[in-house]
């Protein structure tokens, strides 16, 4: 199949040189699901915590899928929940997972549709698709391993590395002096940008912290802010205009995640780009965001939207409309997807999930680099096994 230079990642994936089950007789013969709880070293607070809408975050629920085919190919994927929902995602995944057995592992779209219909009564967004995410991601991992390629290469990578920024050093619970130390450490560790949380009850405190960070970084070093849906429309306009002096890459989630009209008005009114989308849980929701001109940067999250398959559709739509890409969290997956995006993306560096895997991503020159390992390039650590509280298996154990 001939591919044009501007073919999208979905086209590349479908044209990938992989053997089908018709040629190999391969079938999915074993599926294992696990629910692990990853503890955080320090409770984490953003604007929603300071205003009493949420409690500090102390752990992350990780839902893991391990899939093995008759020919011996394996795939690993995961979903997550940062607060309530992890056990529900795991329970739904457990109810639908036996539909995988006997399927051709290359028929990812067919399997996805089958899993959606297995849980049709609970919808096509939210927890229903987040339960499919670890399975879908594991199938893409397996597909790339079968091809003998990193996933990014299977998808037709535009680049071997992606510029990255650090989020975890600038949370609202972190004192300013420590934030400034974190900024220095991040730069020394090869990070290419810094994101600072905003949304303090006292808006002047946001400006004070932002001023100090910009002075520490210098005028040109990439800097972003994230309000975590804290502001109303009036406050967002006022704060957005005050922040234009700081030469920000973007203002993230200034409004409620589902306020498409408000984000569109804000994007039109401000010179600073608007970024949002991390809380959306389906292709259709992202379609509304993109077609509504509600953001300059789209921030889909593969585990939240249902896996790599819907993420690729979001990427395709975003690229057609000239939107920039800055995926949320899950850098282990999003590095590969970002590398396959035609416009230069940003990748969020979050070290929280590092203990789950035996391998780590390489940071250098402000960028995150794709390894030559096949698939996603990760194997589960013994620590991940120790944190696991629930497991279930289907099919013939390897």
From Swiss-Prot:
Purpose of the protein: Catalyzes the efficient dehydration of both L-talarate (also called L-altrarate) and galactarate to 5-keto-4-deoxy-D-glucarate (5-KDG). Also catalyzes the epimerization of L-talarate to galactarate; epimerization occurs in competition with dehydration. Is required for the utilization of L-talarate as a carbon source. Also functions in galactarate utilization. Is not active on other acid sugars.
Q: Where is the active site?
A: 197 (proton acceptor), 328 (proton donor/acceptor)
Per the UniProt entry, what species is this protein from, by scientific name? Salmonella typhimurium (strain LT2 / SGSC1412 / ATCC 700720)
- List UniProt keywords, sorted A-Z: Lyase, Magnesium, Metal-binding
Q: What is this protein called?
A: L-talarate/galactarate dehydratase
EC main class here is lyase
Q: In terms of domain of life, where is this protein from?
A: Bacteria
Q: What is the effect of changing residue 197 to A?
A: Loss of dehydration activity on both L-talarate and galactarate and loss of epimerization activity
Per the annotation, how and in what number is the cofactor bound?
A: Binds 1 Mg(2+) ion per subunit.
Which terms does the UniProt entry file under GO BP? amino acid catabolic process; carbohydrate catabolic process; galactarate catabolic process; L-altrarate catabolic process
Per the UniProt record, the lineage of the source organism begins with: Bacteria, Pseudomonadati, Pseudomonadota, Gammaproteobacteria, Enterobacterales
PROSITE patterns reported in the protein's UniProt record = MR_MLE_2
